[in-house]
Amino acid sequence: MDRKRRFNLTDEPWIPVASGRISLREVFSRADVTGLGGSPLEKIALLKLLQAVAQAARTPRDDAEWARLGTEGLAEACLAYLEKWHEAFWLYGPAPFLQFPAVARAKLLSYGSLLPDVATGNTSVLFQSQKEQPLDDAQKALLLLVNMSCCFSGKKVDKSVALSPGLTKGASGKAGPALCALGLLHSFLMGRSLRETAWLNLLTQKQVAQDIYQDGVGVPPWEVMPQGEVDDVATALTRSLMGRLVPLARFCLLEEEGIHCVEGIRHPDYLQGGMVDPSVTGDRSAKKPRMIWADPQKRP
């Protein structure tokens, strides 16, 4: 694929909402956008990204500073941040957003193979909606984001490619940290607009310091990308809030006809030091944490 810069996520409409699609800039500049579209996995991944942008733009010290900041203050900070880091949000280019050009040697998968509602390989097509369709750039961006944290376990990832020297990978890729084994239940505070939602879910420095993130808020990966699965940057992501919001559980590279995908950073889960996303529901009061699993047959 041509590695010229194109499709900047700050400017291009790619985020599904009721009225169509909007850009990252519009999330924080428009007060009339009330909610996200897409599947549950897409909504979770998008809300985590919006929180990551918000935390990077402005993490208040405490509740009092959070209240003074308000929706408008956070929106202004996020717009300034997106302008400052505009070059980091190109979906295609020499340094594509949340991607690893070094995995180009991994096998090329069809995009449909990473979509849970699409039948590929020897899976039977029962409904027309399950047939694989070409994806546009907006859909590819969304698929990439979902696979950072909500990827499924299995053998579709290429185990033969590792970016960290000497690292050996198992036959099956681990499920993303936002899912774990059975599908974690996520809960978010929802505002009257998407930018108010971002403010309501914004954590303070005091809250982060009291929780389970050894390295605090941390640095978002689009500012400093790891060069391997277990280097210093990757290790820091396993210990920070940013690493839970954008965990890079898969190392991917988008191509015109498909996607290169290998297992990325293996994050500890709730049984390994109690590490969880800030949005998951569970009981950590006992010695062994107990998580609530998503059940479509039950209403949370």
Task: Report each predicted region and the residues it spans.
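Conserved small-residue
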Residues: 1-127, 131-238, 246-248, 255, ...
